[in-house]
Amino acid sequence: MSQISRDEVAHLARLSRLALTDAELDSFAGQLDAILTHVSQVQAVDVTGVEPTDNPLKDLNVTRPDEPMPCLTQAEALAEAPEAVDGRFAVPQILGDE
């Protein structure tokens, strides 16, 4: 037996402000019924003794320490630039004057 009827799909479509054809209503009813069947199968799985988790990985947001390191001077950074203006990289304009 279907878990969702064509009328229920039509109701959901109206709530969602979707204009569906009769063929689409039939198609979506079948697809949603298949989805709900799969969900029912998942819900039927015995999870007794299984610890709830939202992520199987225990190490989240592992980062290295932030350590100061030597970096280029302004002159060194601009030395290989095709063009520099007032100590900054000069690049072609990509946005309009607006």
UniProtKB/Swiss-Prot annotation:
UniProt function note: Allows the formation of correctly charged Asn-tRNA(Asn) or Gln-tRNA(Gln) through the transamidation of misacylated Asp-tRNA(Asn) or Glu-tRNA(Gln) in organisms which lack either or both of asparaginyl-tRNA or glutaminyl-tRNA synthetases. The reaction takes place in the presence of glutamine and ATP through an activated phospho-Asp-tRNA(Asn) or phospho-Glu-tRNA(Gln).
Family statement drawn from the similarity comment of this UniProt entry: Belongs to the GatC family.
Stored InterPro entries: Asp/Glu-ADT_sf_sub_c (IPR036113), GatC (IPR003837)
Source domain of life: Bacteria
GO molecular-function terms, A-Z: asparaginyl-tRNA synthase (glutamine-hydrolyzing) activity; ATP binding; glutaminyl-tRNA synthase (glutamine-hydrolyzing) activity
Biological process per Gene Ontology, one example term: translation
Pfam families: GatC (PF02686)
Protein name: Aspartyl/glutamyl-tRNA(Asn/Gln) amidotransferase subunit C
Record field: catalytic activity: L-glutamyl-tRNA(Gln) + L-glutamine + ATP + H2O = L-glutaminyl-tRNA(Gln) + L-glutamate + ADP + phosphate + H(+); L-aspartyl-tRNA(Asn) + L-glutamine + ATP + H2O = L-asparaginyl-tRNA(Asn) + L-glutamate + ADP + phosphate + 2 H(+)
EC number(s) from the headed UniProt entry: 6.3.5.-
PANTHER family: GLUTAMYL-TRNA(GLN) AMIDOTRANSFERASE SUBUNIT C, MITOCHONDRIAL (PTHR15004:SF0)
Quaternary structure annotation from Swiss-Prot or TrEMBL: Heterotrimer of A, B and C subunits.
Source organism phylogeny: Bacteria, Bacillati, Actinomycetota, Actinomycetes, Mycobacteriales
Keywords from the UniProt entry: ATP-binding, Ligase, Nucleotide-binding, Protein biosynthesis
